[in-house]
Swiss-Prot record:
The keyword DNA-binding applies. Expressed predominantly in dividing tissues such as young leaves, root tips, flower buds and embryos. The keyword DNA-binding applies. Keywords: DNA-binding, Flowering, Homeobox, Nucleus. One of its GO terms (cellular component) is nucleolus. Regulates COOLAIR, a set of antisense transcripts originating from the 3' end of FLOWERING LOCUS C (FLC). Associates with single-stranded DNA that is part of an RNA-DNA hybrid, or R-loop, that covers the COOLAIR promoter. R-loop stabilization mediated by NDX inhibits COOLAIR transcription, which in turn modifies FLC expression. Residues 698-765 bind DNA. Coiled coil: none annotated. The gene is NDX. It comes from the Eukaryota. GO terms for biological process: flower development; negative regulation of antisense RNA transcription; root development; seed germination. This is Nodulin homeobox. Pfam families: HTH_NDX (PF24426), Nodulin_C (PF24679), Nodulin_N (PF25246). Residues 643-655, 765-778, 786-829 have a biased composition (Polar residues).
Length: 913
């Protein structure tokens, strides 16, 4: 039996021999044939020690040191012992006797496993929120990485063999929890150090500071790399997924959150090494999460949800979304130097997102946020879109690498920092590239993962998904297409990389078609047929919405430009005519002021019936203004008639027909104005022009009900005034009146007709006073396009007319105060009312015309109001607003968050002023 050494002899041997590398150790053993070694200690005389005794005693000795209370130098001494053990393990292939003593002894191997597990438990027991001093944090990071990699030295460099040994150990669950905790502590101290460096000026950062940051980052990467290698094997990751401490209490998620949130600035020299190292760490932790989420024995995410830590998982999902935005923004750009591989960050983020989008806990989160990223990608120019997702030969790709960790060098560097001998050169570890993917395979995987995420979010499972989420994803994509794509993706691409707004509809549809064709070529090698079919359904549903959205907006823009040009042209024409008139009067020596007053008096009783005051064939300002006003009224009338005419079944053919007719109308108007300016228009031509207006009105008006049907509804309203709100009764009357006409009247069409009737009665009350019979429409036209809009001024001048005024009663006074010839004006104070007539709040009118977030204010008879205060009975966070959307908000509180004020669109007939 070998006699064991005394502890003091072991301490001397460890302190003296850990500086010797395996080559030097081998030479010392050869010089002494009795399997002993001489070393110089603090004593004057050299000492000789039996290697066999030292090897058998060393693991037990270090375990005893670990179990002792904390004292100065304890961590450094343990690291010295770990370093010496690694040197002995490296020497075993060249020394058979040492191999027999160190590796073949089962009991000794078990002691070494216990040693590593105890050290890791001690390092990972307490979760840190802040780091120790700079040197202590570096020492702890090195000790964690060294202990984990010592397993490869005395068990096997193959991680599969290591998994089998660890799973057979009785304390494997405690080790797994402590190992993740120890790595988390290393990352937390690194994160604190990086945040501190960001506040430093670059001039204050010396070479030593940069080296320390790089060294710390490499130790953290090496420790995480060890855990990642174990999680590559199914038995180990299944054991991790079952660990309640890691899964239920969120240990793995905290580690992932800490790593994914690492941020550094490239201001200091050598940052490239650190940037690449942190990026590879993010890629590895994403891969670990993906493996754990796909565990078969237990649902990792369900365990997290049951433990009440789903908020941690959503924080990680948010970081994944940031990586997707950044990665897709850089996907078509050149990557960093090949000397510093960044890891498969984008690819692993997409793999993890594929898992999360298929989970009910995260479906709504990615539907809300990833749809915005998706729409921005679809807005890329066709060339950039093809190079990113529809190509097998990419201009750039991600590269992955593993650190060839050198335990002896790492421990030696940090120990030299504490010794009086001074600091040595920081070790730079070699990187072994792990690119087992060809360029085409990488490109196909990236495209297939992109398609799988679309398929997961667009797929509707009735038993799992809520009914309100049926079309939510595609609606969010449409909402994203209306936004600026550069505000969604990280602003790294030039503006030319995106399709112009005027061509967005065509460009997005073209990109969708290219993606479909390329996806079909990936079946079945990279993409399954089910995901492809879901992509096709998504494209088939999205393209009609795109055509409807962007073609209609383009038509509106063109019509607006046309009317703006007409207005400018008519104004210039009138000014030219006015200048010519003034010059002519001055040339004749006439009274300029008197004649101008006579000619330009718009309310002159001797003016012609159509108010076209002409002097030598020149049309004055009033004639021009009335013509323009007529065109505007026709435009509004056409829009209203189109709304009633379609009743939810508007078609592109009807819109196209309307455009042709408007074009003919504008041509006739243009001819008339040209003729009026030159004095060449005759009375019969003038009459013919107005016949064109009447013809346009009659052509566009299409009554959905005949006189008998309207009579039936009027009688029904007399008996049941609330018919508009009673859906069952409304459906019954729709069926009844359908039997009296040539067309089938639906309940929604009848409701639309009743709404229009109610609006006309309200406008008639404003302009002519209250109707005598509330249930009779009188001579009100059916279509809202057949009467002037709510903002129209009275067409007949009332000044200088002799009329008999009716004394104003209290009712008349109230009506006069709440309406005017001008209608609602910008800046006017108003009260907002609900359907029951109750006051909701008070505000100021912001806009009354034009468009606001896709709403035509004149056509829909609405205006934009800034609400200053809400009634006490209403909760702004719960009260839904009309015309709500993702862009403007759906409640008063959401509107306030969008604009900084509660800005809403409100029906004019529900405003009091």
């Amino acid at each position: 039996m070998v006699r064991l050494l005394q502890p003091k002899h072991m301490v001397q041997a460890v302190n003296a021999l850990h500086w010797r590398n395996s080559v030097e150790f081998h030479k010392l053993l050869k010089d002494n044939g009795d399997f002993s070694i001489c070393f110089n200690s603090e004593q004057v005389l050299p000492q000789k020690i039996s290697v066999e005794k030292m090897v058998k005693m060393l693991p037990r000795h270090l375990i005893a040191v670990v179990m002792t209370p904390n004292k100065d130098g304890k961590s450094r001494y343990i690291l010295c012992g770990i370093r010496l053990l690694q040197t002995l393990c490296d020497l075993t292939p060249r020394n058979a006797k040492l191999e027999q003593v160190l590796l073949d002894d089962v009991k000794l191997s078990a002691q070494m496993i216990d040693l590593v597990i105890l050290v890791i438990i001690a390092l990972g027991r307490n979760r840190k929120e802040s780091c120790n001093s700079n040197k202590e944090s570096l020492l702890e990071a090195t000790l964690v990485a060294s202990c984990l990699h010592l397993f490869h030295g005395f068990i096997s460099p193959n991680s599969q063999d290591l998994v089998l040994v660890l799973l057979a150990h009785p304390r494997v669950d405690v080790f797994i929890d402590s190992a993740f905790g120890a790595v988390l502590n290393v990352v937390i101290s690194l994160k604190a150090k990086l945040l501190y460096r960001q506040t430093d000026s670059p001039k204050k950062l010396g070479a030593s500071s940069v080296e320390e940051v790089n060294f710390h980052c490499q130790q953290a990467e090496a420790a995480l790399q060890f855990l990642h290698s174990l999680c590559q094997h199914k038995p180990f990751r299944e054991r991790v997924a079952k660990n309640k401490e890691l899964c239920g209490k969120g240990g793995v998620l905290r580690l992932a959150q800490s790593i994914l949130s690492l941020t550094i600035t490239p201001e200091f020299v050598g940052a490239t090494v650190t940037i690449a190292s942190t990026s590879r760490m993010k890629a590895k932790v994403l891969s670990i999460l993906q493996h754990l989420f796909e565990a078969e024995s237990v649902s990792f995410l369900d365990e997290v949800a049951n433990a009440g830590n789903l908020h941690l998982a959503k924080t990680v999902a948010s970081e994944v979304l940031k990586l997707l935005r950044l990665g897709l923004s850089k996907a078509s750009m050149a990557t960093a130097s090949p000397d510093y591989p960044m890891g498969f960050v984008l690819l692993n983020a997409m793999r993890l997102a594929d898992v999360l989008t298929d989970d009910s806990n995260f479906r709504s989160f990615f539907t809300e946020h990833f749809s915005m990223v998706l729409s921005a990608v679809f807005c890329l120019s066709h060339g950039d879109f093809l190079s990113m997702l529809c190509s097998s030969d990419l201009s750039s790709r991600e590269d992955d690498a593993n650190v060839d960790y050198d335990l002896f060098k790492s421990a030696g560097w940090i120990l030299s920092v504490f010794s009086s001998s001074g600091q040595s050169v920081t070790p730079q570890f070699k990187l072994s590239l792990q690119n087992n993917l060809t360029m085409s395979s990488y490109a196909h995987q990236r495209t297939s993962l992109f398609i799988k995420m679309i398929a997961n979010l667009h797929c509707f499972v009735p038993n799992v998904c809520q009914e309100q989420d049926r079309n939510r994803f595609i609606q969010n994509v449409m909402s994203g297409l209306r936004k600026d794509p550069s505000s969604i993706l990280i602003k790294m691409l030039p503006g030319s990389s995106y399709t112009p707004v005027a061509q967005r509809g065509t460009g997005v549809c073209r990109n969708l078609g290219s993606l479909l064709r390329h996806a079909e070529s990936l079946i079945p090698s990279s993409l399954n047929e089910e995901d492809f079919l879901l992509l096709r359904v998504f494209c088939d549903q999205l393209q009609p919405l795109i055509h409807s959205e962007f073609e209609e907006s383009q038509v509106q823009v063109k019509v607006k430009k046309l009317f703006a040009l007409l207005y400018i042209g008519f104004t210039i024409l009138w000014l030219i005519c006015l200048v010519t008139l003034i010059q002519d009067i001055e040339g004749r020596g006439g009274n300029l002021s008197g004649k101008l007053k006579e000619l330009l008096n718009l309310n002159n009783e001797e003016a012609s019936e159509d108010c076209d005051v002409r002097v030598e064939g020149v049309m004055t300002k009033q004639g021009v203004n009335e013509e323009i006003d007529t065109v505007e009224r026709l435009k509004e009338s056409d829009a209203d008639a189109s709304n009633l005419e379609t009743s939810g079944s508007d078609t592109s053919s009807n819109r196209g027909k309307g455009l042709v007719e408007e074009g003919e109308l504008v041509q006739n108007m243009s001819k008339r104005f040209k003729g009026s300016a030159s004095g060449e228009v005759k009375e019969d031509e003038k009459s013919e022009t107005f016949l064109v207006f009447e013809k346009q009105k009659k052509k566009r008006k299409r009554s959905i009900m005949n006189a008998d049907q309207m009579g039936m509804i009027e009688k029904a309203l007399a008996e049941e005034p609330d018919l508009q709100r009673n859906s069952a009764s409304r459906q019954l009357w729709a069926d009844k009146i359908s039997q009296k006409g040539s067309e089938v009247i639906t309940s929604s069409q009848l409701k639309n007709w009743l709404n229009n009737r109610k609006a006309k009665l309200a406008r008639a009350n404003k302009q002519t006073g209250p109707a005598h019979d509330n249930n009779s429409s009188g001579d009100l036209p059916e279509s809202p396009g057949d009467e002037n809009t709510w903002q129209q001024k009275p067409s007949t001048p009332i000044k200088d007319q002799t009329v008999t005024e009716t004394p104003k009663t209290g009712e008349n006074l109230m009506r006069t105060s709440s309406s005017s010839e001008e209608g609602i004006k910008q800046g006017q104070q108003v009260r907002l009312m609900d359907e029951r007539g109750d006051e909701i709040g008070k505000g100021t009118v912001l806009r009354t015309d034009g468009e606001w977030n896709g709403l035509s204010l004149e056509t829909r008879q609405i205006c934009v109001v800034d609400v200053m205060e809400l009634s006490e009975s209403y909760d702004g966070s719960k009260k839904m607003i009309p015309y709500g959307s993702d862009d403007v908000g759906r409640t008063f509180t959401e509107a306030n968050s969008r604009f900084g004020v509660m800005r809403v669109a409100w029906d004019v007939n529900k405003l009091q002023y």
